[in-house]
Amino acid sequence: MSSPPRGEVAARLEPVVAEAVSAAGFDLEELDVQQAGRRRLVKVVVDAEEGVGLDEISEISRAVSKVLDAHEHVLAGSYTLEVTSPGVDRPLTRPRHWRRARYRLVRVRLADGSDLVVRVGEADDEGVVVLADGEIRTLAYRDVERAVVEVEFQQPPAEDLVRLERAADGAPERGGDRGDTEESR
């Protein structure tokens, strides 16, 4: 009896692995199954709002291992399990990725081919508020071709964070009078 193709194995395992990961309080970002000699390599990438530490990786690894053992017929043999968190260079492809990147610096390639380096603010299911070239603006996800977090070795400027917070709160960009009072809203 031949084993199912790699993509089919991952597709059959994804619902039960996702359930185990979710029950532990994490998001399944990726499930990949590859042949590695006589064994299969099952790579599980997980994330959470607050990030993932080594203790959490161990907990998830035990939970996923139990699920895989219960579904060993799908793997058709022995396997090696690798549980990891996404790297810093993971592309931001889902709204939750943007929410987790709040206040981080992100390199964005727009659909029109232009590139921006932005600081991320409030994100919802349609788009994200960013600080780009000193201006607060909103990017719709549909206009983003690729986005990756930039590594920073120092704290972001406090002024940038304040501006993004004010934008999230709906406050005027500058403290001046723009006719935008509580009564006029």
From Swiss-Prot:
Compartment(s) of residence: Cytoplasm
Region (Disordered) location: 162-185
Transmembrane regions listed in the UniProt entry: none
Keyword Cytoplasm applies: yes
GO biological process terms, semicolon-separated: ribosomal small subunit assembly; translation
Cytoplasm is among the record's keywords: yes
Domain of life per record: Bacteria
Main location: cytoplasm
Alphabetized Gene3D superfamilies for the sequence: RimP-like superfamily, N-terminal
GO cellular component, one term: cytosol
Keywords, in A-Z order: Cytoplasm, Ribosome biogenesis
NCBIfam families: PRK00092.2-2 (NF000930)
Protein family according to the UniProt entry: Belongs to the RimP family.
UniProt function note: Required for maturation of 30S ribosomal subunits.
Protein name per UniProt: Ribosome maturation factor RimP
Organism: Saccharopolyspora erythraea (strain ATCC 11635 / DSM 40517 / JCM 4748 / NBRC 13426 / NCIMB 8594 / NRRL 2338)
